[in-house]
Structures are given as structure tokens and as C-alpha cells.
């Protein structure tokens, strides 16, 4: 299916499992979350939708609140966005029944699926209609770094310790012969956009971010040094406590979105890039790395 190479991703995941035993991460920064105000309406039944802290709280609210409004208008439920301070908090919210649906990352989804029975119901598509996703190692456009090997002795910024891109970055460096010990320093930052901002400011020589983030910072002076193999897009998931009727209704609304976009009925300008083109049905098999 598509060009997602499981033969490439299998050794990546095996590498990540082994590395997670010994790799010491810097904890995510606890960031105050903005208050999200629900729009009043006739629907009394609240459904909570979580998003892992891949971006700053302000960016998540800006990009995902339109999706909440779409779901509220196209289902019998009133959707409310619920943020978290780190990736695992969203998983905990799903497991404890505090949220019903969520956008997870690939790495957190594998953990949540195996531990709590959380299932993928939809996968975002890109502008070409594909579920392929990528992570990019970035540098400043003014940087003299031209290859991954040039990162020896340089500083490097990763996103959250629980982000798939963080692990992918470590693997890509290792494949190029660059160990973490070869870097002058490295750090896990809270958000992908913060990684790009710090590389842009010169606080780090390079960093690893989602490709959509790298693209959004290109005009500001970011250059892609290397791109990861294709990986599945981030899964939209349902908690195990959600009944089959609610699951089906929400899944149908998500899968119908791309038709409404194509028909000009729904305008997704200003939505988060990863959900602005609609969805395909979720396939758990793609995450069986």
C-alpha cells in the first residue's frame, strides 16, 4: 500500500526499542494550556477530542478547533478539544475515559494500541490523496552543513521524547555513521515548531521535525538536509470505552470530509495541514512495525 516501506521501518522500530532502554531524554517542558471555549449549541452530549502536544498549545487550538466545529456540525455530538502537556498524557486521557477520540503519533499509537486496545479509525491524507508522511532533518539555509556526516561535532534538536520523529532522527543519524555521542550536544524540545524556531535562530545546528513543519518554515530560512523513508500519516483513534454507534458516526463524518472539500461545501483553509485534506479509513496493519 503506497510506498511505505515496512522493511525499512521494522529495523527502525527494533532499533528504537533497544535504544529506549539506555537513552536518557530531557523531559518535556510543562506548558500552561490555553482555555478552550466551547460554542453554545443545542447538543448536550459532549465528546472530548485530544491531540498530542506535537505543536504549541496555541498552534493546536488554531489548527484543530475547526475540525471540532466540523464534527459538531456533522454528528449528533458537541465536540470539545482537550489538550495535554505531553504525548503520554493524551494516551492516559484515552485510557481513563477522559477523552473519546484523539490524534496520536505513530510511536504513541503503537504503545496505546498494545496496552489499552485503542484503535485507529481514520488516517489523514495529503494534498495528493496519499497517507504517506515524512520527517525531515533541517538546517538553516545559511548553514555550511551539506550532509548528515557533517553533523559530527554539531548540536542537534529533537522534538518530544515520545515523538516518532525523534526516534527516526536518531536512526537516520546512526545510519549515516553519526552517534549521539558524536554530537556536541543534543536536546529534546517540547514541540516540532520549537525545534524549527531554534534551528532558525542558531541555537542548534540542525534538528528533526515533521515534514509539514519543515515546509512551513522554508520561507523563513529553513533547509531540508535529509528526509526519512515514507511512514504512515498520524492516526486518529478511538478509545476502547466508546460504543460502536458513536465510533461509526464519527468515523463516517471524518471519511466524508474529503468529498465535502472536493465539492466546495467545506473550506479547510486555516486548518492544521495534516487534517486539511480529509481522511482515509484507518489500517492498524500499517502500524505493525
Q: At which residue positions do the language-model features occur?
A:
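N-terminal hydrophobic or amphipathic helices and topogenic motifs
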Residues: 1-89, 264-289
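Periplasmic-binding protein-like
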Residues: 48-54, 127-136, 218-258, 269-289
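Generic structural signal for residues in well-ordered beta-strands
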Residues: 79-81, 186, 224
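Short helices/loops that flank or line small-molecule/ion binding pockets
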Residues: 88-102, 115-116, 149-152, 191-204
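A ligand-binding cleft/hinge motif common to bilobed small-molecule-binding domains
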Residues: 103-116, 175, 197-226
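Glycine/small-residue-rich loop that forms an oxyanion/phosphate-binding "nest" at active or ligand-binding sites
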Residues: 111-129, 133-139
Amino acid at each position: 500500500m503506497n510506498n511505505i516501506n515496512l522493511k525499512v521501518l521494522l529495523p527502525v522500530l527494533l532499533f528504537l526499542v533497544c535504544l529506549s532502554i539506555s537513552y536518557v531524554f530531557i523531559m518535556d517542558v510543562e506548558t500552561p494550556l490555553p482555555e478552550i471555549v466551547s460554542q453554545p449549541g443545542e447538543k448536550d452530549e459532549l465528546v472530548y477530542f485530544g491531540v498530542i502536544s506535537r505543536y504549541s498549545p496555541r498552534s493546536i487550538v488554531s489548527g484543530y478547533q475547526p475540525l471540532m466545529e466540523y464534527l459538531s456540525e456533522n454528528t449528533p455530538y458537541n465536540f470539545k478539544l482537550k489538550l495535554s502537556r505531553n504525548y503520554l498524557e493524551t494516551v492516559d486521557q484515552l485510557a481513563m475515559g477522559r477523552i473519546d477520540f484523539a490524534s496520536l503519533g505513530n510511536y504513541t499509537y503503537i504503545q496505546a494500541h498494545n496496552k489499552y486496545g485503542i484503535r485507529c479509525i481514520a488516517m489523514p491524507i495529503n494534498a495528493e490523496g496519499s497517507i504517506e508522511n515524512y520527517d525531515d532533518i533541517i538546517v538553516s539555509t545559511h548553514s555550511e552543513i551539506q550532509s548528515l556526516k557533517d553533523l559530527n561535532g554539531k548540536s542537534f534538536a529533537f522534538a518530544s521524547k515520545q515523538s516518532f520523529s525523534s526516534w527516526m532522527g536518531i536512526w537516520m543519524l546512526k545510519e549515516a555513521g553519526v552517534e549521539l555521542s558524536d554530537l556536541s550536544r543534543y536536546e529534546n524540545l517540547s514541540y516540532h515548531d520549537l525545534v524549527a524556531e531554534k534551528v532558525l535562530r542558531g541555537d542548534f545546528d540542525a534538528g528533526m521535525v515533521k515534514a509539514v513543519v519543515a515546509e512551513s518554515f522554508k520561507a523563513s530560512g529553513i533547509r531540508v538536509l535529509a528526509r526519512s523513508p515514507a511512514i504512515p500519516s498520524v492516526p486518529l483513534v478511538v478509545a476502547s470505552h466508546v460504543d460502536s454507534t458513536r465510533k461509526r458516526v464519527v468515523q463516517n463524518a471524518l471519511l466524508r470530509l474529503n468529498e465535502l472539500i472536493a465539492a466546495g461545501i467545506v473550506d479547510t483553509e486555516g486548518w492544521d495541514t495534516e487534517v486539511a485534506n480529509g481522511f482515509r479509513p484507518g489500517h492498524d496493519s500499517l502500524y505493525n512495525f
